[in-house]
């Protein structure tokens, strides 16, 4: 078994077998605390193209202290439907039952996303499998398409979950991030698929995974792949934070005060750039083990006052006052370059409900990079990042890196920087 420690460089878990052959893409990562185990998922493809996806694969990582030993790759053949390709792994751990739910979509044949959108006829199925033993064995597949989407599927040209992890809220609700290409107009009995626009939304369960439902589309902004994190303010009120991919050169952020049923109007974060056409990114929340004294006055006494967040309207803002650190912090991973997918960065936000509070990025990987997924180990001060990377292309491998909260604080060069001040990243 391969071993990774918190002080080591990134370790490849899935490696491209041939430049025009078998490729692994679309990472997803969760940590199962009772088993001290990471579950690292990816798509196995016959080429790097989306339409050449085959099935999902898994590697289990057993953690001892600040090191992880990885078991060999395992193909998840139960996560399949006949005549379909399996895509977009999105796992979530349910803490009461101990179940791991692995959501994904199954898409007919080799039809491309563009073909799905133009036809206006959804060929995707919403499915999951589950495990009671931290990924050793898995249930048979369950198709939730009719249960969750139902007749509304006629307005969805296509949809997908994740990719990346889902979460469980303090209330017990399980959340699976998703997006759908929504067709708003019909002309008599005919769809108008060219009008389809993507919008993020949440799929959720309030009964430990027995039944599932979907929330409202996040509008009006075009948003695609997203992840969410629960933020607890100083007053103890939970807010669900959503970070979504956009084609608008900046990341979209939105907040929900009803556990993800609906979100307020999203806004663009000018501190978090997107490359052309955007890229998936990951976000996790965590409670800091300690707040270093030097981080209390993050920008200095002469710095501009912290702005109230445009995300959350003042009538429902849970924070007692501006400029206070939240009980929850956010960590975010994404390519840092505005022009192309290179230089994977880790950003820290110590006041998620305030504006302009993202740190400069700590560069975890220099060079081509792509999709990523983060996992936070509660009460351990440890984090895992599973990410696409390479020396010439982003699809050469999917690597894993383990790091500590102290490493983050030592690399992000202070925190709440004002807009436009986070242009100089910290290299690893």
Curated annotation (Swiss-Prot):
It is found in: Cell membrane; Membrane, Caveola; Early endosome membrane; Recycling endosome membrane. Expressed in brain. It is an enzyme of class 3 (hydrolase). It catalyses: Hydrolysis of alpha-(2->3)-, alpha-(2->6)-, alpha-(2->8)- glycosidic linkages of terminal sialic acid residues in oligosaccharides, glycoproteins, glycolipids, colominic acid and synthetic substrates; a ganglioside GD1a + H2O = a ganglioside GM1 + N-acetylneuraminate; a ganglioside GD1a (d18:1(4E)) + H2O = a ganglioside GM1 (d18:1(4E)) + N-acetylneuraminate; a ganglioside GD1b + H2O = a ganglioside GM1 + N-acetylneuraminate. Palmitoylated; may regulate intracellular trafficking and anchorage to plasma membrane and endomembranes. Pfam families: BNR_2 (PF13088). GO terms for molecular function: exo-alpha-sialidase activity. One of its GO terms (cellular component) is lysosome. A motif (FRIP motif) lies at residues 24-27. The modification Phosphoserine is found at residue 314. CDD domains: Sialidase_non-viral. InterPro entries: Sialidase (IPR011040), Sialidase_fam (IPR026856), Sialidase_sf (IPR036278). It comes from the Eukaryota. Keywords: Carbohydrate metabolism, Cell membrane, Endosome, Glycosidase, Hydrolase, Lipid degradation, Lipid metabolism, Lipoprotein, Lysosome, Membrane, Phosphoprotein, Repeat. Interacts with CAV1; this interaction enhances NEU3 sialidase activity within caveola. Interacts with EGFR; this interaction mediates desialylation of EGFR and enhances downstream signaling. Belongs to the glycosyl hydrolase 33 family. Exo-alpha-sialidase that catalyzes the hydrolytic cleavage of the terminal sialic acid (N-acetylneuraminic acid, Neu5Ac) of a glycan moiety in the catabolism of glycolipids, glycoproteins and oligosacharides. Displays high catalytic efficiency for gangliosides including alpha-(2->3)-sialylated GD1a and GM3 and alpha-(2->8)-sialylated GD3. Plays a role in the regulation of transmembrane signaling through the modulation of ganglioside content of the lipid bilayer and by direct interaction with signaling receptors, such as EGFR. This is Sialidase-3. It comes from Bos taurus (Bovine). The gene is NEU3.
């Amino acid at each position: 078994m391969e071993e990774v420690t918190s002080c080591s460089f990134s370790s490849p878990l899935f490696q491209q077998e041939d430049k025009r052959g078998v490729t692994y893409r679309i990472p997803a990562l969760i940590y199962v605390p009772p088993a001290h185990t990471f579950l690292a998922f990816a798509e196995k493809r016959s080429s790097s193209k989306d339409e050449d996806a085959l099935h999902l694969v898994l590697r289990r990582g057993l953690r001892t202290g600040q090191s992880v030993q990885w078991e060999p790759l395992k193909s998840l053949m139960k996560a399949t439907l006949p005549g379909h390709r399996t895509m977009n792994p999105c796992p979530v751990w349910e803490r009461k039952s101990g179940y791991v739910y692995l959501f994904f979509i199954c898409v007919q044949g080799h039809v491309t996303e563009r073909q799905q959108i133009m036809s206006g006829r959804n060929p995707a199925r919403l499915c999951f499998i589950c495990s009671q033993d931290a990924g050793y064995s898995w249930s048979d597949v369950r198709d939730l398409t009719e249960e969750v989407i139902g007749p509304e599927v006629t307005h969805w040209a296509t949809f997908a979950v994740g990719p990346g992890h889902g979460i469980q809220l303090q209330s017990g609700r399980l959340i699976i991030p998703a997006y759908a290409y929504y067709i708003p107009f019909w002309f008599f009995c005919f769809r108008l698929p060219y009008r389809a626009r993507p919008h993020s939304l949440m799929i959720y369960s309030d009964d430990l995974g027995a039944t599932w439902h979907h929330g409202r589309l996040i509008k009006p902004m075009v948003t695609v792949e997203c992840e969410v994190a629960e933020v607890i303010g100083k007053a103890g009120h939970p807010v669900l934070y959503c970070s979504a991919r956009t084609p608008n050169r900046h990341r979209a952020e939105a907040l929900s005060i009803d556990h993800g049923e609906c979100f307020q109007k999203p806004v663009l974060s000018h501190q978090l750039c997107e490359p052309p056409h955007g890229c998936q990114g990951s976000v996790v929340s965590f409670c800091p083990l300690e707040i270093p004294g030097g981080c209390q006055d993050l920008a200095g006494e002469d710095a501009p006052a912290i702005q109230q967040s445009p995300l959350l309207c003042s009538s429902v803002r849970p924070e007692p006052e501006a400029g206070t650190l939240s009980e929850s912090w956010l960590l975010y991973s994404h390519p840092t370059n505005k022009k192309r997918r290179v230089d994977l960065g880790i950003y820290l936000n110590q006041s998620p409900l305030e504006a302009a509070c993202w740190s400069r990025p700590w560069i975890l990987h220099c060079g081509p990079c792509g999709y990523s997924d983060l996992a936070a180990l509660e009460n351990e001060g440890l984090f895992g990042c599973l990410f696409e990377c390479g020396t010439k292309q982003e699809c050469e491998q999917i690597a894993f890196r383990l790091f500590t909260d102290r490493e983050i604080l030592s690399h992000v060069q202070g925190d709440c920087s004002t807009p436009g001040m986070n242009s100089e990243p910290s290299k690893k």
